[in-house]
Amino acid sequence: MGNAIRLLRKCLNSHGVSASSGGVSALSRDLLNFETTSQVPEKLGSYVVSSQKAQANWYRKILEAWKQAKPRPKTPEEASRLVIAALKNHQKADVEGLLSFYGLPSPHNLVEVPTEAPVSLPKGVRFELNTLPVDTKSVADGDTVTVYVSSKDPLVSSSLPKDVSLAAVKRAKAREKKNYTEADALHKTIIASGYRMISFQNEEVLAKKFRIRLSGIDSPESKMPYGKEAHDELLKMVEGKCLKVLVYTEDRYGRCVGDIYCNGKFVQEVMLKKGLAWHYVAYDKRAELAKWENEARQKRVGLWASSNPEKPWEWRKNKRGGN
């Protein structure tokens, strides 16, 4: 019976939402409707094996957990974890069916919450960057992001060119006088020197630009399968956030190669576990990176849904060769 339901589930339309956008809001709406009417979604029965009476019992449990959650789930992963915890003693087929109905990750596809940022610097780290909030346009692809660090940071202030500092002062005075033409010209000079004025907490902050290449992973290029998904996942994690970057070295393109932490999440871990990057073993042999890639391979998530996905370094080599 369980196999028949799972087969039927593949043939039917879902709740009409995507895991990346509408699943959480659809669940929220249905919980609100259940609280008012005690009715479960009509089409849910096509995805689960239990009766409507049992389904109503699930929604009572999920609704209670939803109300107690602080903050409320915002991502598909958070919503999935809440449902799984609320229905931990129920049939696996029912839980997976309910998650499938909303387009939420199933238990075997659920990415574990990454580890917190290390208290002490790992071996090989040369310095640490603490960035200003990341802009939407700063994410180039799934493994490269541009960040800015305030000139008040000791690491930046110790090497701040005098002409850049002076240009920032002159720009502020020009803006006070509403001479925006001069202010814009001065800002172009600042930008050409590798700095920028960033609006932060109701003030203009002089900040230095750093291009960051995530250490140990290689995501699909933008024109490759899953290139857009990798870009979008990285953007979703870092957009508007202040990051901690542990820098190991500089690559031949002048980028800082390092680990990125965002709200305690290790960004490379998320990208690997979601199947949106390869472990770049040629440049980083950390065992945990290989482990996270292998977990994604076994679950066949992301790019590992393909039996033999093209490696980005081979794709780049072929492009350079004119193939």
Swiss-Prot record:
Pfam family, one: SNase
Residues with lipid group (S-palmitoyl cysteine): 11
Residues reported in the UniProt entry to bind Ca(2+): 143, 218
Activation and inhibition: Inhibited by Zn(2+).
Keywords: Calcium, Cell membrane, Endonuclease, Hydrolase, Lipoprotein, Membrane, Metal-binding, Myristate, Nuclease, Palmitate
Residues carrying lipid (N-myristoyl glycine): 2
Gene3D superfamilies recorded: 2.40.50.90
Cofactor binding: number and manner: Binds 1 Ca(2+) ion per subunit.
Claim: Repeat is one of the keywords in the record: no
Xref: PROSITE patterns: TNASE_2, TNASE_3
Enzyme Commission (EC) number: 3.1.31.-
GO molecular function: endonuclease activity; metal ion binding; nuclease activity; nucleic acid binding
Residue stretches making up the TNase-like domain: 130-306
Family membership noted in the UniProt record: Belongs to the thermonuclease family.
Stated role: Enzyme that catalyzes the hydrolysis of both DNA and RNA at the 5' position of the phosphodiester bond. Possesses activity toward the single-stranded DNA, double-stranded DNA and RNA. May be involved in genomic DNA degradation during programmed cell death.
Name of the protein described by the UniProt record: Staphylococcal-like nuclease CAN1
Organism: Arabidopsis thaliana (Mouse-ear cress)
